[in-house]
Amino acid sequence: MTQVASTNSPLLHAEQLSSIRGGRVLFENLDFSVSAGQLWQVSGPNGAGKSSLLRILTGLLEPSDGVVSFDGQPLNQNWSEYCQQLLFIGHKAAVKGELSALENFHWQQQLSSVQDVDAWDLLEKLGLLGLEDELTTRLSAGQQRRVALTRLWATQASLWILDEPFTALDVQGIALLQQRFVEHLDAGGTIIFTSHQSLTLSGLTPEKLSLEYRGEVL
């Protein structure tokens, strides 16, 4: 059993979570609680189940066993409220392929009514300037991930669940994303993100949940 203690009232609680995929045990009997305003880093090697855990926490994937609760209730009992508070960016970037990089950002702004962001400055800092008019289907996987990350500057969601958000970012992009993390946490937001490698985040000390590659086949 893996258990990480939380001192505050939990926003998100996982109880006895287990995941078995393709006959292989990814993890089992995970217990942890995430409080509002916390930053959590889920780490571990490829194949340890990090992405599966995040998808379970978002409700997109059913656990093999266990329950995820939001604000004291199982996800299936307050799904609508949960979705209003959640922003999920998976390992495979979810972008609208029929829109350009710039249009993707403006589309997200319209959905969230967040307008006080300089889109051109943001695209430049994420290394997307010069690609703003390209359809996202023509961009590389790394470029698409950076387009998806622009959503973090155009959302009012309080809970962010992000799969490998620092992948494909250069030094400037990493610094920019770290600053956005700080802004969101200072505003009372909550972040859960994965990383397959050890990260040193300037000014940030995340709670850590480490998964191991088990390789057990049932």
From Swiss-Prot:
**SUPFAM superfamilies hit by this protein:** P-loop containing nucleoside triphosphate hydrolases
The UniProt catalytic activity note for this protein reads: heme b(in) + ATP + H2O = heme b(out) + ADP + phosphate + H(+)
Q: Which UniProt keywords apply?
A: ATP-binding, Cell inner membrane, Cell membrane, Cytochrome c-type biogenesis, Membrane, Nucleotide-binding, Translocase, Transport
Which cell locations does it reside in?
Cell inner membrane
- Where do the annotations place ATP binding? 44-51
Please name the InterPro entries in this protein's record.
AAA+_ATPase, ABC_transporter-like_ATP-bd, ABC_transptr_haem_export_CcmA, P-loop_NTPase
Tell me where on the tree of life, at the top rank, the source sits.
Bacteria
Query: What EC designation does it have?
Result: 7.6.2.5
Which GO terms of the cellular component aspect does the record hold? plasma membrane
Q: What class does this enzyme belong to in the EC scheme?
A: translocase
Family membership noted in the UniProt record: Belongs to the ABC transporter superfamily. CcmA exporter (TC 3.A.1.107) family.
What is the designated name of this protein?
Cytochrome c biogenesis ATP-binding export protein CcmA
**Which species is this UniProt entry from?**
Idiomarina loihiensis (strain ATCC BAA-735 / DSM 15497 / L2-TR)
The coding gene here is ccmA
